Amino acid sequence: MKFVDSADLIIKAGKGGDGAVSFLHALFVPNGGPNGGDGGDGGSVYFQGDEGKHSLLDLKLQKKYSAQDGFKGDIKNMHGAKGEDKIIKVPVGTILYDKKTNNILADINENNKLVLIAKGGKGGKGNARFANSRNKAPTIFEAGELGQEFEIRAELKVLADVGFVGLPNAGKSTLLRAISNSKPVVADYPFTTITPQLGVARTKNNDTFIVADLPGLIQGASLGKGLGHQFLKHIERCLVICHIIDASGNFGSEDIIKNYELIRNELKTYNLNLEKRAEIIVLNKMDLDEAQLNLLDEKIINYFKNKKVIQISGLKKENIDQLLFMIYEELKVAKKQSLWELDKNNNQDEMVIYKFEEQKEDIQAYNKGNNRWEIAGETIFKIYQKFPIWTEDNLLMFNEKLKETGVYETLVKKGIKKGDFVKVFDYELEWTD
């Protein structure tokens, strides 16, 4: 089983800035030429791999990301500035899907890898670009193109950094709730957790790591008893093991030591290379009087004196910050060791990368009845968006571009007549011969 963290996002690149319509106005130059500048390109949206991130929690908190629009062109041939790009940092191993097609847009498989997901719209041309020998004072301009927009799903196959192990009812699920955003089922009976529960823990310094509350272990798990191999398979991916022990055991120090050794032996039997893994012994339920008395026993003090031990109460959230700090420090060391390189290459799924291509849409012409027609399609929309009919020259250009698509010829073949009206998105134009 792999843990999968996911987040749904709306990604929007910036719109290009509109081109400007202006003319030179200077002393002794009464009929200056056009000098409207071009608009700037819209900002694009990129995703970047960041090995310092371990979850998609940030993406879940902010579901919409937009790059900045390009700035409009101005007088004196001044070009608008480009919109600022948006860079979204995600953990290495994040895969991005187009929600509509379920195609893979990108596999962020390297640290600092930068991937373009939504391209900003091109800035529109100002009227200075349209001057020619036939039209020396054009009022034609282009609106900036719209930036790309996608609904995407980000998925991260999570390898838990830290595994909570312990006998059933040791308080692992309660502790997971205390240190993370996870909400596992908690009840006062054995085997509450039957599948791994995942949580993102965050220290006071905003360092994060992934914690897995693993199913309660019983004697004989290495031989397949109980949840057996299923449990042990999960823990071999963890870099740090937190051994959670109920310090309030009915039989005092003997109970605590026996429980620790039982699980330790099961892990050894499964050949988990424990000597290479950091271990923290977490004595839980210290809010209970029985636990306080048990830890006064010299046997306990001597047995654990050379081990990393911390006393906490998951229920009362006592000493939790110190536990998180201890875990994170151990994790930093563990990630530098060769074990991390060995583990992260195990059981890697083969990945097929699909090239994302925009769907080409045919031009459509509809007879709506009552002398009303409508034209639509991606190509028609681009012309509509690019040439706002705010000036007479733009209206002429708009018609010329539509004519080039062949849609007018299609309308004639379908029987359009002089005086009919043609709807082009929110424009309605009268047809003339």
Swiss-Prot record:
Domain Obg: start-end pairs: 1-159
Alphabetical keyword list: Cytoplasm, GTP-binding, Hydrolase, Magnesium, Metal-binding, Nucleotide-binding
GO terms (BP aspect): ribosome biogenesis
Record bears the keyword Metal-binding: yes
Endpoints of the signal sequence: none
Binding site for GTP: 166-173, 191-195, 213-216, 284-287, 313-315
GO MF: GTP binding; GTPase activity; magnesium ion binding
Disulphides: none
Enzyme class: hydrolase
Domain OCT, chain residue ranges per copy: 355-433
InterPro entries: G_OBG, GTP-bd, GTP-bd_Obg/CgtA, GTP-bd_prot_GTP1/OBG_C_sf, GTP1-OBG_CS, GTP1_OBG_dom, GTP1_OBG_dom_sf, OBG_GTPase
All copies of domain OBG-type G, residue ranges: 160-332
Needed cofactors: Mg(2+)
Database matches in SUPFAM superfamilies: Obg GTP-binding protein C-terminal domain (SSF102741), Obg GTP-binding protein N-terminal domain (SSF82051), P-loop containing nucleoside triphosphate hydrolases (SSF52540)
Pfam families referenced in this protein's UniProt entry, alphabetically: DUF1967, GTP1_OBG, MMR_HSR1
Main function: An essential GTPase which binds GTP, GDP and possibly (p)ppGpp with moderate affinity, with high nucleotide exchange rates and a fairly low GTP hydrolysis rate. Plays a role in control of the cell cycle, stress response, ribosome biogenesis and in those bacteria that undergo differentiation, in morphogenesis control.
Family classification: Belongs to the TRAFAC class OBG-HflX-like GTPase superfamily. OBG GTPase family.
Subunit structure: Monomer.
Protein name per UniProt: GTPase Obg
Organism: Mycoplasma mycoides subsp. mycoides SC (strain CCUG 32753 / NCTC 10114 / PG1)
Lineage: Bacteria, Bacillati, Mycoplasmatota, Mollicutes, Mycoplasmataceae
Gene that encodes it: obg
